[in-house]
């Protein structure tokens, strides 16, 4: 019989694979931006936001904050690198006002993380205290980011069309949440459990909406418009 530690490691590896797939979801958008040499109507906001989310989760997984969380570090460290690449691509091909917006946002995020790290290491002296503070912050940021799928779901209901909500990405979001919920339960971690429990709920609602409105969808509309709407909603997120 597999012991809980081994089972947790296996589940965490599966979670890493699914989350990596979600982090890869924006690649077609980035390729299109690169070919056009312009960001067009695509927005950098979801990628800039995910940078902070990944930084926070990577810090959370460090042994002096939450011990035995290596798999949280690996996927969010990887995600952080990928999101920084995406943001860089936006910066290179964006207009001056958008570049200024990206620069200001990134500076604010770096300063915020520096303050969080300093306060955590200087004022909190146990992993229990540190994991509580960072864990709560991670939950808050994740809940805020779940507002993006709500925007897409509202659009689907309004238009009675699922072309703005790809099925496999919705399914992957659901599976990602479920896997990390299992991971959090094998060695109880409320800070991973809560946001991914909400992610699972969001995923299942997306799937129900997809099934409900699939038959009423007009698939002949402009695919490029669909991609812009979906990318700008910032739903392509993967996290622990």
From Swiss-Prot:
- Residue stretches spanning the membrane: 10-30, 46-66, 73-93, 104-124, 132-152, 166-186, 191-211
Q: What conditions trigger expression of this protein? A: Slightly induced by the powdery mildew fungus G.cichoracearum and the pathogenic bacteria P.syringae pv. tomato.
**Cell location:** Cell membrane
Q: Which GO terms describe its molecular function?
A: sugar transmembrane transporter activity
Q: What residue ranges lie in the Cytoplasmic compartment?
A: 31-45, 94-103, 153-165, 212-240
- Give the UniProt record's GO annotations in the biological process aspect: protein homooligomerization
Q: Which Gene3D superfamilies does the annotation name?
A: 1.20.1280.290
UniProt domain MtN3/slv: residue ranges: 10-95, 133-217
Question: Extracellular topology: which positions?
Answer: 1-9, 67-72, 125-131, 187-190
Q: Which GO terms describe its cellular component?
A: plasma membrane
**Pfam families (alphabetical):** MtN3_slv
Q: Which UniProt keywords apply?
A: Cell membrane, Membrane, Repeat, Sugar transport, Transmembrane, Transmembrane helix, Transport
Report membrane topology. Multi-pass membrane protein
What exactly does this protein do?
Mediates both low-affinity uptake and efflux of sugar across the plasma membrane. May play roles in nurturing the male gametophyte.
Q: How does it assemble?
A: Forms homooligomers and heterooligomers with SWEET6, SWEET8, SWEET9, SWEET11 and SWEET12.
Q: Which family does it belong to?
A: Belongs to the SWEET sugar transporter family.
Q: What is this protein called?
A: Bidirectional sugar transporter SWEET5
Organism (species): Arabidopsis thaliana (Mouse-ear cress)
Lineage at the top is: Eukaryota, Viridiplantae, Streptophyta, Embryophyta, Tracheophyta
């Amino acid at each position: 019989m597999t012991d809980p530690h081994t089972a947790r490691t296996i589940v965490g590896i599966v979670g890493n694979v699914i989350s990596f797939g979600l982090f890869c979801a924006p690649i077609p958008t980035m390729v299109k931006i690169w070919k056009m040499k312009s960001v067009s109507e695509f927005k950098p906001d979801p990628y800039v936001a995910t940078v902070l989310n990944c930084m926070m989760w990577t810090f959370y997984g460090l042994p002096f904050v939450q011990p035995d969380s290596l798999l949280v570090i690996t996927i969010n460290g990887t995600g952080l690198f990928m999101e920084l690449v995406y943001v860089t691509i936006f910066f290179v091909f964006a207009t001056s006002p958008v570049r200024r917006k990206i620069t200001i946002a990134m500076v604010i995020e770096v300063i915020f993380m520096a303050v969080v790290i300093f306060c955590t290491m200087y004022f909190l002296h146990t992993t229990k205290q540190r994991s509580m503070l960072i864990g709560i912050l991670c939950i808050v940021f994740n809940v805020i980011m779940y507002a993006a799928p709500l925007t897409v779901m509202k659009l689907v209901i309004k238009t009675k069309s699922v072309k703005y909500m790809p099925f496999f990405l919705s399914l992957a979001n659901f599976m990602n949440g479920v896997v990390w919920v299992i991971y959090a339960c094998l060695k109880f971690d409320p800070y991973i459990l809560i946001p991914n429990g909400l992610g699972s709920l969001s995923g299942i609602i997306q799937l129900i909406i997809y099934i409900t409105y699939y038959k009423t969808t007009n698939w002949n509309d402009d695919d490029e418009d669909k991609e812009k709407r979906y990318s700008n909603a910032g739903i392509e997120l993967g996290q622990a």
